[in-house]
């Protein structure tokens, strides 16, 4: 009886201690030689003067650390509290990354690394320089400059300022990119891209300019609005080869588009999440009726991902992607079904599934063979490069999807309008400077089994 009473009183005391409030006092930041202190404080889940219980304080510190890590500006982030009476003073220590990267580029004009491995054709390579600065003026502003020559020629410039106002909720940016191609994906046959090449003149030119507005009223909510101008030029050879490539086989196309994206992001680590969730909604109106053209397409797309910590190094994830389109005919150059970017079914990397509407579900269960470990290379003098995190996961997955295509250009394409699915095993590596590498074995609904390489998180 006495033991029971003692445990009861200890339980009450514990609850009372955790419920007692502390007031956030001074907030200090160290290690930020480049990054402005105000940029770091913007990511905190608490403010000076807030009253929090001990439990709430610990949770807020953990969430704040994740937010700062997810800026991708720091190798390490540590947050500690010093409680003196009812006042909790907060100390934040960061170790900054290297921000300026003049990177030589050798790119292959393929949808993914696996499709290039199928042929190993280096004649489709382009070389150049990609210059990026991820923390201009110490405010998280991003400058990108691209200069490419070779198979495809490309010039690009973009600048993004995440915050312009005192509350750090409103930002702007712009981008401009010019591309000249001698070979393009002109049509799809047997569910694979068919390329058309011209040697004596460019087969396609395109120039896209955009202005962007960002609004972030809350820590985990992002709004993006873009107004874009597009100018395309197609060779006669291209539109003769595929009359559906552009609207009414035109050789010149110019139009405006408007794009909006709402994103809610509670992932613990964006490059390779293990806990939390992510969801977004995208709306794109192509053709605003301002210029004389025949483009009038509206699409809605949504992506949702949920990540779970099951127990003792076991994790699970599920992702759903869905897209709907309206507006009638979609020229081939604008039509995007599955097989592009992150919208694909594992096991179908060598295929594209054309269509106007689609849905994909992806599932994973993984085991941490090597949970996150951080190695210090002491022979490298700077902390910007001597901190190497490594984690390795065994991954079991299953995907399924469906593409609706009511614009059938070629009867040899059998994958649209049919349920597709796959499953497999993989090994994932998450490491240096947010890098991810995956090797997977997958079998699809056609019974094909292959090994694939990827360099982005599976879900």
Annotate each predicted stretch with a short phrase:
Residues 20-112, 130, 144-163, 298-304, ...:
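Periplasmic polypeptide-binding modules associated with outer-membrane biogenesis and secretion
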Residues 94, 226, 317-321, 395-397:
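Outer-envelope exported proteins of Gram-negative bacteria
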Residues 89, 94-259, 267, 337-343, ...:
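Gram-negative/organellar outer-membrane beta-barrel architecture
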Residues 408-458:
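C-terminal beta-signal and terminal closure region of outer-membrane beta-barrel proteins
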Residues 368-374, 380-423:
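Outer-membrane beta-barrel transmembrane domain signature
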Residues 177-181, 282-288, 323-327, 395-403:
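Short glycine-rich beta-strand segments
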Residues 1-23, 459:
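Bacterial Sec-dependent N-terminal signal peptides
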Residues 255-387:
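C-terminal outer-membrane beta-barrel translocator/porin domains of Gram-negative envelope proteins
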